């Protein structure tokens, strides 16, 4: 089996937009932890346009947040792709629809007087939308992430690191990585097949020097730690040639266009909804994190070598309408028994998820580059001993 996954640097135009959307979201949550927001960003040709819905749009300095985000990434000149100091900023922010707000605030169960409906009941809040999400975990890395996307993220992060630390001072913010691995008959990663790096750079740098420097300073340190067989690997560094014009001046950016980069690469399914710019009442956010949290606990309990968790919701309903798991033939117990144990131990109602994972905090800009999963700075990446013991006991 061959598996390929890609990542992008924080200066990629789409990732720039993800970070702007989530930086604004963090600012909104700082002012009101119960705020509702759905923020989209477009960037291109020296213009940044943010639009969407926010429950308290006047509470934050949106232009100031946008400029700081752009500058912190490293876009300080139009020659690099955009200048955070001088770019044009346009806003089209409105309040959330009352109908949507009511559906979230007063669930179908609450309106029909079903279930536990006491004060502050988790059944009162409904899902902010319909849809399905997928969570995944496996034994390929200590982080329980697929190895191809893990390596791709490390390469992309390393590109930004050597740029910011001026180890390779001629690099500019835009960049991408891609990793192809070969798997053995037991579906374990075995060989490194191909690495692709595309790095934006200043016009003055020699292309051969750039290729050598990136191979030695970025690629080899990351790859050497994997233990993969690299004897037949192909390394393609800036295979298209020079990459001087980059960032939003070369390709327009848009929030939500790197959803596979954000999750598990090509190793798992994706429900199609983007995460960035959305407050935790949105199912693409709370349910995606919950699905990952559950998947990690199943693998940590040694009930499966890998698992994909699917959760589906209806707008305005607190309880999921469907739940499914796939252990790819690696489960150590019957799937029906495992599924029942998961549903017994974990509460999938939106308010319960938000409470369990402490999601009403300004944590979201950090998620918007180098993956939402695989980093233990996030609550959904941490194994809860009580939940793990309960899961073990439930089977």
Swiss-Prot record:
HAMAP family cross-referenced by the UniProt entry: S_AdoMet_synth1 (MF_00086)
Binding sites annotated in the UniProt record for ATP: 12, 174-176, 242-243, 251, 257-258, 274, 278
NCBIfam families on file: metK
Quaternary organization: Homotetramer; dimer of dimers.
Function: Catalyzes the formation of S-adenosylmethionine (AdoMet) from methionine and ATP. The overall synthetic reaction is composed of two sequential steps, AdoMet formation and the subsequent tripolyphosphate hydrolysis which occurs prior to release of AdoMet from the enzyme.
Keywords: ATP-binding, Cytoplasm, Magnesium, Metal-binding, Nucleotide-binding, One-carbon metabolism, Potassium, Transferase
Reactions catalysed according to its record: L-methionine + ATP + H2O = S-adenosyl-L-methionine + phosphate + diphosphate
Protein's organism: Tropheryma whipplei (strain TW08/27) (Whipple's bacillus)
Known pathway: Amino-acid biosynthesis; S-adenosyl-L-methionine biosynthesis; S-adenosyl-L-methionine from L-methionine: step 1/1
Binding residues annotated for Mg(2+), in chain numbering: 14
Official protein name in the record: S-adenosylmethionine synthase
Protein residues bound to K(+): 40
Location in or out of the cell: Cytoplasm
Classification via PROSITE patterns: ADOMET_SYNTHASE_1
């Amino acid at each position: 089996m061959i598996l390929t996954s890609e990542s992008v640097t924080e200066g990629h135009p789409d990732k720039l937009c993800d970070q702007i959307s989530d930086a604004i979201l963090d600012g909104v949550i700082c002012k009101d932890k119960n705020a509702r927001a759905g923020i989209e960003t477009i960037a291109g040709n020296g213009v940044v346009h943010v639009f969407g819905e926010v429950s308290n749009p006047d509470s934050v300095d949106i232009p100031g947040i946008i400029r700081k985000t752009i500058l912190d990434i490293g876009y300080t000149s139009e020659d690099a792709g955009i200048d955070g100091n001088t770019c044009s900023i346009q806003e089209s922010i409105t309040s959330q629809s009352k109908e949507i707000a009511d559906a979230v605030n007063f669930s179908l169960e609450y309106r029909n007087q079903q279930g536990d409906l006491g004060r502050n009941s988790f059944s009162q809040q409904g899902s902010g939308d319909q849809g399905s999400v997928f969570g995944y975990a496996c034994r390929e890395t200590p982080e329980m992430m697929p190895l191809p996307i893990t390596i791709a993220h490390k390469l992309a992060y390393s590109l930004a690191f050597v740029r910011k630390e001026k180890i390779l001072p001629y690099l500019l913010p835009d960049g991408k990585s891609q990793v192809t691995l070969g798997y053995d008959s037991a579906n374990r990663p075995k060989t490194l097949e191909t690495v692709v790096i595309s790095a934006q750079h200043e016009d003055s740098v020699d292309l051969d020097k750039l290729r050598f420097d990136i191979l030695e300073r970025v690629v080899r340190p990351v790859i050497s730690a994997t233990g993969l067989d690299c004897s037949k690997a192909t390394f393609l560094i800036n295979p298209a040639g020079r990459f001087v014009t980059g960032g939003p001046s070369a390709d327009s950016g848009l929030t939500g266009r790197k959803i596979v980069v954000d999750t598990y690469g090509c190793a798992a399914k994706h429900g199609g909804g983007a995460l960035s710019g959305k407050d935790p009442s949105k199912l693409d956010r709370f349910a995606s994190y919950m699905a990952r949290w559950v998947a990690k606990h199943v693998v940590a309990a040694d009930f499966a070598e890998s698992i994909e968790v699917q959760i589906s919701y209806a707008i305005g309903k607190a309880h999921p309408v469907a739940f499914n798991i796939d252990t790819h033939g690696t489960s150590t117990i019957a799937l029906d028994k495992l599924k029942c144990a998961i549903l017994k131990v974990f509460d999938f109602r939106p308010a319960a998820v938000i409470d369990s994972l402490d999601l009403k905090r300004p944590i979201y800009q950090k998620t918007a580059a180098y993956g939402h999963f695989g980093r233990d700075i996030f609550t959904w990446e941490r194994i809860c001993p009580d939940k793990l013991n309960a899961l073990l006991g439930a089977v």
